[in-house]
Amino acid sequence: MKKFVTLLLCMLPVSLFAHVNDGIRQAMDNYDYETVVTLIEPDCQDSLLLITKAQALKAMNRYPEAIGVLNSLILKDSTNTKVLIDLAECYKLTGNSRRAANCYQKAMNLQPENKFFRLQFIRSLLASEDYEEARTACHGWLERDSLSATGYKYLGQAYEGLQDAASAFLSYNIAYRRDSLDAQTVARIAGIFNNNQQFKDCLLYT
């Protein structure tokens, strides 16, 4: 009898934990994010539950809280690219493009061949007006893929930010030759021509 009672006492926490997990899963499925956050204990150390909590907080636009949870996960495992990208997105949504760039860079260093990480890293640098680093990052991209129209387009934006219109035009021109249907590239070239009152040249591209 004593062994049976002991066994029941041991099984109770496991059963309770499973019940709570089921409740969290069901709440997520039903988009009941407030319940998700409530069910996960403040001192929870389970990484999967903390990721779920961060997702729920993010869905409710509670970005500073989500950032806190995600940073605690990075302290435990700095190589988790999924957490790094979630953290970068939260920083972006709070207008902190520089910190977002740092997260994308860490993810990019872990997976150098991942084009999405590299693209978001450069976009975040441009958004934070860190044009010199964006220029360097674009050259790094083009060393890997010299045919990338997008790489040259962002290089042009970096040069524009650095007030180097000639280099910006050369970069946009290469991007245009690789992808003449990119409306943003065409608009950037037209903008340079208009600023220099080269209206006839502008018409050639538009």
What residue ranges belong to the model's regions?
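Conserved small/polar residues in nucleotide/adenosyl-binding loops
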Residues: Y205-T206
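N-terminal leader/linker segments that initiate helical-solenoid repeat arrays
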Residues: F17-N71, L75
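Conserved structural position within tetratricopeptide repeats
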Residues: E41-Q45, S72-L75, K106-N109, H139-E143, ...
